[in-house]
Regions:
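N-terminal start-of-chain detector that recognizes signal peptides
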Residues: 94-97, 119-125, 165-171
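Extended, low-complexity, intrinsically disordered C-terminal regulatory tails
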Residues: 104-137
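A broad, structure-centric signal for solvent-exposed, well-ordered loop/edge residues
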Residues: 60, 67, 78, 131, ...
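Catalytic cores and adjacent binding grooves of peptidoglycan-active enzymes
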Residues: 4-18, 139-210
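Active-site acidic/histidine clusters and adjacent loop/turn architecture
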Residues: 56-116
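N-terminal secretory targeting signals
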Residues: 1-58, 210
């Protein structure tokens, strides 16, 4: 093996990660958190297919930390974890735990923001929410940290067919593989926000041993 190849394989292996949050194995968390997060368990989606829930999470120590940590140049962590009393009690206080795939969602939303050229606002309960959240009836990418409900873009509120369909088209043209809910009132549709998701993505950090 050439020295160039060895260097390429080893480059960065000893670098200190610059992301400030600690990675935790959900199976090692206290019981109250394991019950709420259900790490690694299977959960049926609306079609009856089994989806495996995330096992690895970032530990968020405080709301102050969430207000300061950038997931991308224009999105802070707090924007993805706004929940209310519908979330399970252990997950309404700190420390909080968010699936590691949340960083992938932030990168996609950053690209979407570049495409629309203005601020993108995530709804309360519209970012990450646990499988124990009252909105979580079936497996939803929100519980994987890979879905966001956008209620406003710039000065435009997404509460009409024209607005939702306009920005849905931009999202699909900008983000390969993104899924958006169609406009409407039946289950599986959206009439007051733009739903974007990457599907059921599991993220296992590189330094995880198991």
């Amino acid at each position: 093996m050439s020295s160039t190849v060895r260097f390429a394989e080893n480059a960065g292996m000893n670098e200190i990660p610059n992301f400030p949050l600690r990675v935790v194995d959900g199976l090692a968390l206290p019981l109250e958190y394991r019950k709420a997060l259900r790490p690694g368990e299977e959960w049926k989606d609306t079609t009856g297919h089994l989806r495996q829930l995330p096992r690895y999470f970032y530990e968020v120590p405080s709301w102050d930390s969430a207000m300061k940590i950038e997931l991308s140049p224009n999105f802070l962590l707090w924007e993805f974890i706004q929940v209310d009393v519908r979330e399970a009690p252990p997950l309404r206080t700190f420390p909080r735990y968010v699936p590691c795939a949340i960083t992938l969602l932030a990168v996609c939303l950053e690209r979407f923001r570049e495409a629309v050229g203005t601020l993108v606002h995530i709804s309360a309960n519209g970012g990450y929410r646990s499988p124990s959240h009252r909105f979580s009836k079936n497996a939803t990418p929100h519980a994987w940290g890979t879905a966001a409900n956008i209620y406003r873009i710039g000065d435009t509120y997404l509460d009409s067919r024209s607005a939702i369909e306009r920005f849905s088209l931009i999202a699909r043209q900008t983000l390969p593989g993104i899924w958006t809910r169609p406009y409407g009132t039946p289950t599986g549709y959206a009439e007051d926000h733009l739903h974007l998701d990457l599907g059921y993505v599991l993220s296992v950090p590189r330094d995880v041993q198991s």
